């Protein structure tokens, strides 16, 4: 491709990347262009070129796609958060479905995966593996129960908060993200006013100076409880009682804490927590299970869709109350406790010690006694418990990080031979890879369904059910009725002639 930086060109967007950038092609050369939509014809400016692909900036939409809409957020193009705001929600769901389906077919080699348009049709019309319609939201806004806002200063030294521009640490000022709860705006303005009043400076990455680095806000959607955690570059927040007094007057405020992070790092939260108001956690529900959520807890950010996601996982697990279930990468026990009410025993495995403590506490507050949690890596705990202690599994549920399951973990699952494996995935490429591994070793995909947990972004969750292809215990023979009676007559004749 004979093009250099700042050259302009025209291209039609044919596809989108996992991070929501439009993909256009010129004579086999691939361009990635942010803020474009499938079907757009655009003018773009070259930013960077590689041997077979390059990056360009959108200059002008020459012919808009039928799927293009006006973004609601005023900083949509500058912010690194919502990559798909310029695409209609219906088309977003279609894009995510296609992405997962194509990965499963191309990477997972599931050529026989049938797409089903209506729920319920799969049982009678599609005897093999089925790909069910994506579970979307009626209103894909204000769905996030968690937000982390960086604090910094603009070129004039004024305190700003908002979100980072894509692939940078430049803060785009925005105190009201339309994906977050409305209380975020009031909380951020109160903290910003407090900092200005008492001359408390925001953190500066370059000089490792200043105090306030980030503010974490969480809300229990079912309980209405609010949590605020200030991440500080120090051990003391001057005049903190003034801030607490203001924050606690916000309706629902339940917990206020400080996270001490004095390291030169991009990691947001520190290891030391100082609780300055409330119990140090909030509570929320998924279904009828109550969860305690601390500042460090992993908890799904979209509660409405989480209930759909876990409900689907529970359905695919097919529990009758007699099964032994292993829940790998279990976090604070969200799926484990959801399953435990319908299983004989659930074992959860998690590498983060705080999450395991939270999981055990969540089991206690719900009175769930048939669950046990192990601290450690899934690829170490599962082989140990199976090979040394002989613990079996009827169902295995996995919900790994984006990198997918470790091969040793998958190998142990195959050796254990559970009837069903329920795979919850946040990355369809690694899902497809791991599904291929299991299918090559005695399992078959039965159902796949996407859940739009992260509306207006390029990410999607997927639930996949695999069943064990065990040999039938009996031989099934289909015999025509006339053949049946002919055989019976011959048997009678043979018996009479003996």
Predicted regions located by residue number:
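Terminal RNA-binding accessory module
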Residues: 1-75, 119, 124, 372-373, ...
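Rossmann-like S-adenosyl-L-methionine
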Residues: 2-7, 18, 239-498
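Short, conserved phosphate/pyrophosphate- and ester-handling motifs at nucleotide-, phospho-/glycolipid
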Residues: 39, 180, 302
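Extended interfacial segments that mediate partner engagement and assembly in macromolecular machines
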Residues: 59-71, 77-202
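Short, solvent-exposed loop/turn elements at beta->coil junctions and helix N-caps
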Residues: 132-140, 205-206, 214, 218, ...
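Internal alpha/beta scaffold segment
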Residues: 170-213, 234-260
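Short, aliphatic-rich beta-strand segments
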Residues: 217, 224-233, 290-294, 395
């Amino acid at each position: 491709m004979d093009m250099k930086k700042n050259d302009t060109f025209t291209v039609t967007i044919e596809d989108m990347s996992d991070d929501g950038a439009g993909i256009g092609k010129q004579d086999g050369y691939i361009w990635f262009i942010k803020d474009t939509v499938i079907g757009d014809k655009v003018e773009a400016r070259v930013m960077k070129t590689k041997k077979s692909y390059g990056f360009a900036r959108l200059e002008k939409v020459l012919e808009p796609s039928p799927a293009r809409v006006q973004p609601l957020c005023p900083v949509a193009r500058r912010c690194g958060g919502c990559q798909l705001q310029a695409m209609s929600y219906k088309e977003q769901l279609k894009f995510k479905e296609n992405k997962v389906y194509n990965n499963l077919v191309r990477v997972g080699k599931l050529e026989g995966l049938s797409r089903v348009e209506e729920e319920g049709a799969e049982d009678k019309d599609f005897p093999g593996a089925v790909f069910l319609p994506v579970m979307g939201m009626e209103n894909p806004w204000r769905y996030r129960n968690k937000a982390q806002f960086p604090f910094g200063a603009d070129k004039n030294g004024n305190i700003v908060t908002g979100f980072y521009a894509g692939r940078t640490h430049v803060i785009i000022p925005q105190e009201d993200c339309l994906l977050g709860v409305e209380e975020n705006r009031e909380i951020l303005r109160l903290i910003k006013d407090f900092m200005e009043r008492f001359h408390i400076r925001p953190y500066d990455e370059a000089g490792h100076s200043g105090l306030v680095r980030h503010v974490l806000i969480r809300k229990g959607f079912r309980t209405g409880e609010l949590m605020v955690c200030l991440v500080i570059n120090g051990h003391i927040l001057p005049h903190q009682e003034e801030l607490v007094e203001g924050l606690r007057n916000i309706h629902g405020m339940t917990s206020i804490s400080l996270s001490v992070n004095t390291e030169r790092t991009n990691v947001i939260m520190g290891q030391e927590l100082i609780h300055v108001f409330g119990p140090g956690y909030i509570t929320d529900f998924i279904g009828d299970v109550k969860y305690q959520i601390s500042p460090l807890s992993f908890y799904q950010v979209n509660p409405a869709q989480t209930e759909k996601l876990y409900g689907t996982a529970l359905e695919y697990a097919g529990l009758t109350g007699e099964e032994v279930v292993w829940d790998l990468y279990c976090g604070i026990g969200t799926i484990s406790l959801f399953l435990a009410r319908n299983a004989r025993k659930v074992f959860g495995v998690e590498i983060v010690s705080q999450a395991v403590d939270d999981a055990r506490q969540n089991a206690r507050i719900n009175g769930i006694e048939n669950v046990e949690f192990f601290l450690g890596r899934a690829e170490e705990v599962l082989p140990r418990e199976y090979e040394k202690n002989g613990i079996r599994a009827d169902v295995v549920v996995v919900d790994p990080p984006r990198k997918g399951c470790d091969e040793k973990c998958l190998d142990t699952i195959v050796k254990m031979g559970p009837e069903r494996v329920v795979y919850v995935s946040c990355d369809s490429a690694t899902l497809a890879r791991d599904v291929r591994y299991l299918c090559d070793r005695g399992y078959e995909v039965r159902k796949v369904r996407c859940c739009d947990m992260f509306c207006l972004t390029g990410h999607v969750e997927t639930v996949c059910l695999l069943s064990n292809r065990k040999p039938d215990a009996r031989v099934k023979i289909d015999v025509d009725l006339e053949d049946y009676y002919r055989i019976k007559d011959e048997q009678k004749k043979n018996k009479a002639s003996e």
